[in-house]
Amino acid sequence: MNNTEYYDRLGVSKDASQDDIKKAYRKMSKKYHPDINKEAGAEQKYKDVQEAYETLSDSQKRAAYDQYGAAGAQGGFGGGAGGFGGFDGGGFGGFEDIFSSFFGGGGSRNPNAPRQGDDLQYRVNLSFEEAVFGVEKEVSYNREATCGTCLGSGAKPGTAPVTCRKCHGSGVMTIDTQTPLGMMRRQVTCDICHGSGKEIKEPCQTCHGTGHEKQAHKVSVKIPAGVETGQQIRLQGQGEAGFNGGPYGDLFVILNVLPSKQFERNGSTIYYSLDISFTQAALGDTVEIPTVHGDVELAIPAGTQTGKTFRLKGKGAPKLRGGGQGDQHVTVNIVTPTKLNDAQREALQAFAEASGEKMLHPKKKGFFDKVKDALEDI
């Protein structure tokens, strides 16, 4: 069968759209339906139309048919019943992967070549100040290390691995498989040496032939000033042991900066919220402001409003890129008193009158109000 017969059955061209194919199918299906068409051969043509539409209406099967004909579409390259399942989780997995598997495209890698070990991750908590100024920390963790008994060979001391008797050191085996396209050859990992190309007759008693053993490991980490949560530091060669004499993997230290009770931070800028009284805001004052670099004095000008922000230059965190120091932003929050004594209330009333404010004078406190205030102060 040529690669256009299915299209011919539906009466469409090879570049027909899915809508065109669907319309043609409905037309041809109705034309040859056994309940409508009683001519000899109509039933077979109806089945042929169904077969063609089943393939061409599926984009994956259609692609297989266009390239390989009916054998490709019906043979199950898409992982269907009776086909080669598992190439791409059930879908039409791509011919590059399929032919790589059959013709040994992935088997050219030398199984005995040195291979780097796996990378590891380690999370480190930093205080707010440690993140600002930098710190050196020692981290401890377990990792797969080269076996100290066999030095990574996997063989008992005094012995050595030998060439695999099945794959003869290649680490792979060649298998012929019958497919709808004919006989195909593929390479698979050797089931004796598991790809290493070597057999261990007498395994090491410490690592049981793996060449690796779990070991406790410590390493010092220099954390630069100005780091933030989520940033990573890579320590080369501090991961897990390699294979066939390959290098160790790397350790990635992931940083987590703990919150501060006083400050907030975004990049090199530190934020601080300053509570002041309304008299300080109205009359002005000089107050001490905490910073990560020590306390500094800040002049609050008379008439300062809530939300006013002052900048303390150079009192922030270091800039990781470009150098220099960030600033600290101080935002004012004017605190309104919730309780007033008689003298304070009278003073405020006098202030309101002097300001020309029209307001209802609050009712003077009675005996029970004074008792309630006294109990709250206890």
Curated annotation (Swiss-Prot):
Zinc finger (CR-type): 134-216
Keyword Phosphoprotein annotated: no
GO molecular-function term, one example from the UniProt record: zinc ion binding
Disulfide bridge positions per record: none
Domain J: 5-69
CXXCXGXG motif repeats: 147-154, 164-171, 190-197, 204-211
Biological role stated in the UniProt entry: Participates actively in the response to hyperosmotic and heat shock by preventing the aggregation of stress-denatured proteins and by disaggregating proteins, also in an autonomous, DnaK-independent fashion. Unfolded proteins bind initially to DnaJ; upon interaction with the DnaJ-bound protein, DnaK hydrolyzes its bound ATP, resulting in the formation of a stable complex. GrpE releases ADP from DnaK; ATP binding to DnaK triggers the release of the substrate protein, thus completing the reaction cycle.
Protein family: Belongs to the DnaJ family.
UniProt protein name: Chaperone protein DnaJ
Organism: Streptococcus pyogenes
